[in-house]
């Protein structure tokens, strides 16, 4: 009997924390992150996987040590980076075992100084893959992340975009 379970295949971050665009692959549903203490392994995983599965952005949930010091907006706008706004994306690509069938869930976040976060969630259900045949940014010499409306237009009927 063929095993048709879904497995995590990769996670991706675009314009999030220290990452302009980064993917972390899984092998057989598992991932190993290596690095020295304080290099960001826990923060990276804490901010992606639980957040995509339940949408809980409370500060103590985002900080691997349980403090309330880091808010989601600080992962997009650092205090001294000079930006007034930034849109970022997080996503998790799933792959059906023994198949070339893919499903992606993700989240877009727009941070603006002094304002509440805008956030939206999306799924790609038609097999398109981020970084292969679907991109979360426009590339016109400079990569500019898609707005929520641009994402809706690009996904079209191959998935969904929803607000929480």
How should these model regions be labeled?
Residues 1-164:
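Extreme N-terminal "head/tail" segments of very large remodeling/mechanoenzyme assemblies
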């Amino acid at each position: 009997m063929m095993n048709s379970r879904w497995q995590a295949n990769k996670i991706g971050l675009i314009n999030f924390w220290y990452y302009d665009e980064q993917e972390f692959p899984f092998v057989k549903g598992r991932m190993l992150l290596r690095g020295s203490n304080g290099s960001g392994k826990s923060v990276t995983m804490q901010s992606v996987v639980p957040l995509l599965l339940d949408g809980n952005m409370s500060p103590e949930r985002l900080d691997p040590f349980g403090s309330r010091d880091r808010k989601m907006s600080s992962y997009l706008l650092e205090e001294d980076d000079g930006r007034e706004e930034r849109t970022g994306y997080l996503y998790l690509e799933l792959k059906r075992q023994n198949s070339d069938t893919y499903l992606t869930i993700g989240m877009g976040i727009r941070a603006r100084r002094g304002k509440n976060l805008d956030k939206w969630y999306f799924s790609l259900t038609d097999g398109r893959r981020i970084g292969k045949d679907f991109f979360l940014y426009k590339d016109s010499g400079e990569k500019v992340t898609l707005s929520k409306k641009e994402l809706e237009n690009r996904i079209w009927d191959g998935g969904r975009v929803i607000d929480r």
